Regions:
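Long, hydrophobic alpha-helical segments that serve as membrane-spanning/inserting helices
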Residues: 1-12, 16, 37-255
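Hydrophobic membrane-insertion alpha-helices, especially the h-region
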Residues: 19-34
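N-terminal low-complexity, Pro/Thr/Ser-rich intrinsically disordered segments
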Residues: 248-268
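Asparagine-centered strand-capping/turn motif at beta-strand->loop junctions
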Residues: 267, 275-282
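Short, surface-exposed beta-strand/strand-loop-strand elements in extracellular ectodomains
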Residues: 284-295
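Intrinsically disordered, low-complexity Pro/Gly/Ser/Thr-rich segments with frequent PxxP/GP/PP motifs
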Residues: 296-320
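Structured interaction patches on ligand/partner-binding surfaces of diverse proteins
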Residues: 304-305, 328-348
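Short, surface-exposed ligand- or partner-binding patches at beta-edge/loop junctions that are enriched
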Residues: 319-331
Length: 348
C-alpha cells in the first residue's frame, strides 16, 4: 500500500499511513511490555505469598513452642513462690523432685527465622497491603528476638554459675549428682535453712520468670497479631483467622462492647488477666483507660483499623473489671467490662 501511494504521488497519505503503522507497532510493543510486566508481577506476588506462608508456618510453630515454654515456667513460678514464701516443708522436698530442682533446670525458647530471612531478601517486592503485618514481623524478629536470645544466654549462664558454686562448696551436691539427685538430709537442710539458697531462687525468678517468661508472652501476642494481619491482607476475616489457629492460640469469644451504668474502680481480689484483641474500626485513634493488677492507671493507644495496641507489652485486662474507651480528644465513649476469659472486642 505504501508503494502504491508513492507511485501515485500521494505523499501525504503515505506519511499518514506510515505513521499509523508506527503507532500500531508502538501500541503492540506497549501491550507486550504490559503483559510481560503483568506476568512478572504475578510471579512476584506468588513468590511473596509463598514467603508469607513460610513466615506464618514459622510463627505457628514458634507459638506452639512458646505455649509449652509458658506452661513450663508458669508451673515453675508457682513452685518458686512456695519456696520464697517459706511454704515448703521437708516432706515436700522429699516427695516432689520439681521443688528440689527449681534452680537446677531451665528451658530455652528458639525462634525460626527462615521465613523472615527470605522475606528480607524480597522486601522490595512486598505489596503495600502487608504494611501492617510487617510492623509486627519486624518487631518480632529484631527487638523481641534479641530479648529472647539475651534471656536464653543469661538463664544458661546463671545456671552454670550456680551449679559450679554448689559443686565447689557443698558435698551434698556432688553426692546428689552421683546418685541421680536422690534427696539427702544435707540437701534438704540447705534448701530449708540456707539464706543463700533463697538468693539463688530469687535470681532464678528474676531472670526466668520476670524476664524470660514475660518476653515469651509478649512474643506470643505479637506473633498471633502478625498471623492475623497477614490473613487480613489476603482478605481472610478475623473470625476465620482466629478459628484456623484455634489449636495454637486458644478460643476467642466474639462480643460487642456494652456500656455498664456504673464505673467504680475496685482493687481485684482474684486476679485473672485476660489477653485481649480490640478491633478499632473507628476512623480515629482510640485510647483504653484502665487499672492494671497493681491498681496503676494505664492509657493504651489503639490506632484506627488496628487490632491490638501500638505498645511493646501485651494488653491484659482483669476479668469482670471495667475500663473506659476514650477518643483522641479525651472524651469518654463508654465504660465497658470484660465477661469472658478470651475476648474479641469491636470498637464501633
Amino acid at each position: 500500500i505504501r508503494y502504491d501511494l508513492m507511485e501515485k504521488n500521494k505523499t501525504g497519505k503515505y506519511f499518514k499511513y506510515a505513521i499509523g503503522e508506527i503507532v500500531l507497532v508502538v501500541i503492540g510493543i506497549l501491550i507486550a511490555l504490559s503483559i510481560n510486566n503483568w506476568n512478572e508481577q504475578v510471579k512476584k506476588d506468588k513468590k511473596i505469598a509463598t514467603v508469607f506462608e513460610t513466615v506464618k508456618k514459622d510463627l505457628l510453630s514458634d507459638i506452639n513452642e512458646a505455649n509449652e515454654f509458658i506452661d513450663y515456667y508458669e508451673e515453675k513460678d508457682s513452685l518458686i513462690n512456695l519456696v520464697v514464701n517459706r511454704k515448703v516443708t521437708n516432706e515436700h522436698y522429699q516427695l516432689n523432685p520439681h521443688l528440689r530442682t527449681v534452680v537446677m533446670f531451665y528451658q530455652e525458647l528458639s525462634i525460626n527465622k527462615l521465613g523472615y530471612e527470605t522475606l528480607k531478601e524480597n522486601i522490595n517486592d512486598v505489596p503495600t497491603k502487608y504494611e501492617n503485618a510487617l510492623i509486627d514481623i519486624n518487631l518480632i524478629y529484631t527487638n523481641i528476638l534479641q530479648r529472647i536470645e539475651v534471656n536464653n544466654k543469661s538463664t544458661r549462664q546463671l545456671l552454670e554459675r550456680t551449679l559450679q558454686k554448689w559443686a565447689d562448696n557443698y558435698n551434698w551436691y556432688r553426692t546428689s549428682q552421683e546418685t541421680s539427685q536422690t534427696p539427702n538430709d544435707d540437701m534438704i537442710n540447705f534448701f530449708l535453712k540456707d539464706s543463700s539458697y533463697l538468693g539463688d531462687v530469687r535470681m532464678v525468678k528474676m531472670l526466668q520468670i520476670d524476664n524470660h517468661l514475660s518476653t515469651a508472652k509478649v512474643y506470643k501476642i505479637k506473633a498471633i497479631s502478625a498471623l492475623i494481619k497477614i490473613d487480613l491482607a489476603n482478605n481472610i476475616t478475623l473470625e476465620e483467622s482466629l478459628k484456623a489457629y484455634q489449636n495454637s492460640i486458644g478460643s476467642f469469644e466474639f462480643i460487642n462492647l456494652k456500656p455498664i451504668e456504673e464505673f467504680v474502680y475496685k482493687q481485684p481480689t482474684d486476679l485473672q488477666p485476660i489477653p485481649v484483641f480490640i478491633n478499632n474500626v473507628m476512623n480515629e485513634k482510640l485510647f483504653i483507660y484502665y487499672k492494671n493488677a497493681e491498681g496503676v492507671d494505664l492509657l493504651i493507644p489503639f490506632e484506627k483499623n488496628s487490632i491490638e495496641p501500638n505498645t511493646f507489652d501485651s494488653f491484659n485486662l482483669i476479668k469482670d473489671f471495667p475500663f473506659i474507651v476514650k477518643d483522641s480528644k479525651g472524651n469518654a465513649l463508654g465504660t465497658f467490662k470484660t465477661t469472658h476469659l478470651y475476648n474479641y472486642f469491636n470498637l464501633k
